[in-house]
């Protein structure tokens, strides 16, 4: 089957590695004071691609935790995709030059779709769109505001733009270990040609198994956060499952 990727997540707040519940900055749990050490740990566990979000940046509209991100890039060799506060072409370019493999544009994808198109054209394969939905509608500004458009409506705007992936997050499940919203994610993946990555709520090896079933064949991967930090998801078991599925 196609190469499905399990991305371990590092969310940055005040230079620390945290997990939020439903995107609420007041409900942040610090899991590691040293994000670079956490990144190194994930790389050593065998993960092949890291997912990083600058939470402060998402709220500020510009990069805030650049120092922590740069420390990670110096520490690990695996590719990193980064979101949070990326709202203009200059920021996209700056991060890619610093060694980020793929940037994720969220709020600006809703507010300024031309930015995504310009960035994807200039940097083919290196621009992803982050669509975070609450009750089907896309939320912006670090999830502080909910728009009136659906994830599918926005995703369709980028069908021919050369976007590398869409990261679809179900806010209601994020950080709560309730399981991925595979129904909504698969429905989105089946409606567009852009690869879709599932995010929000991954709770156990069962989610990884579900992601590898025939009905989820269009999914490009999933993001694991709290389940890894809480020890509910064994990295070795999850990665072995994925490797075996690839070989099948």
Curated annotation (Swiss-Prot):
Reaction(s) this enzyme catalyzes, per UniProt: 1-(5-phospho-beta-D-ribosyl)-5-[(5-phospho-beta-D-ribosylamino)methylideneamino]imidazole-4-carboxamide = 5-[(5-phospho-1-deoxy-D-ribulos-1-ylimino)methylamino]-1-(5-phospho-beta-D-ribosyl)imidazole-4-carboxamide
Keyword entries, A-Z: Amino-acid biosynthesis, Cytoplasm, Histidine biosynthesis, Isomerase
Cytoplasm as UniProt keyword: yes
Pfam family, one: His_biosynth
Metabolic or biological pathway: Amino-acid biosynthesis; L-histidine biosynthesis; L-histidine from 5-phospho-alpha-D-ribose 1-diphosphate: step 4/9
Transmembrane portions of the chain: none
Top-rank lineage group of the source organism: Bacteria
E.C. number(s) listed in UniProt: 5.3.1.16
CDD domains tied to this protein: HisA
Main location: cytoplasm
GO molecular function term, any single one: 1-(5-phosphoribosyl)-5-[(5-phosphoribosylamino)methylideneamino]imidazole-4-carboxamide isomerase activity
This protein's GO CC annotations: cytoplasm
Disulfide bonds: none
Active-site residues, Swiss-Prot/TrEMBL: 11, 132
Cell compartment(s), UniProt: Cytoplasm
GO BP annotations, alphabetical order: L-histidine biosynthetic process
Gene3D superfamilies, per the entry: Aldolase class I
Entries under NCBIfam families matching the protein: 1-(5-phosphoribosyl)-5-[(5-phosphoribosylamino)methylideneamino]imidazole-4-carboxamide isomerase, PRK13585.1
Family in the record: Belongs to the HisA/HisF family.
Protein name: 1-(5-phosphoribosyl)-5-[(5-phosphoribosylamino)methylideneamino] imidazole-4-carboxamide isomerase
Protein's organism: Bradyrhizobium diazoefficiens (strain JCM 10833 / BCRC 13528 / IAM 13628 / NBRC 14792 / USDA 110)
Gene: hisA
């Amino acid at each position: 089957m196609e190469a499905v990727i399990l991305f371990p997540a590092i969310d940055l707040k005040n230079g620390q590695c945290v997990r939020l519940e439903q995107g609420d900055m007041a409900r942040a749990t610090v899991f590691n004071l040293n994000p670079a050490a956490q990144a190194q740990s994930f790389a050593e566990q065998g993960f092949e691609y890291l997912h990083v979000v600058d939470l402060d940046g998402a709220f500020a509209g510009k990069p805030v935790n650049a120092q922590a991100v740069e420390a990670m890039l110096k520490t690990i060799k695996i590719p990193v995709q980064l979101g949070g506060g990326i709202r203009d072409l200059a920021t996209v370019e700056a991060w890619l030059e610093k060694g980020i493999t793929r940037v994720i544009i969220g709020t600006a994808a809703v507010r300024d779709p031309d930015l995504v198109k310009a960035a994807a054209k200039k940097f083919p394969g290196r621009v992803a769109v982050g669509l975070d939905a609450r009750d089907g509608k896309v939320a912006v500004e670090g999830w502080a505001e909910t728009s009136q458009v659906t994830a599918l409506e926005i995703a369709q705007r980028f069908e021919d733009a050369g976007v590398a992936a869409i990261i679809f997050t179900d806010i209601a499940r994020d950080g709560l270990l309730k399981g991925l919203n595979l129904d909504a994610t698969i429905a989105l993946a089946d409606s567009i040609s852009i690869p879709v990555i599932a995010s929000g709520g991954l709770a156990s090896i069962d989610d990884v198994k579900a992601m590898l079933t025939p009905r989820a064949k269009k999914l490009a991967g999933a993001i694991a956060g709290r389940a890894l930090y809480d020890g509910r998801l064994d990295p070795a078991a999850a990665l072995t499952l994925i490797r075996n599925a690839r070989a099948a």
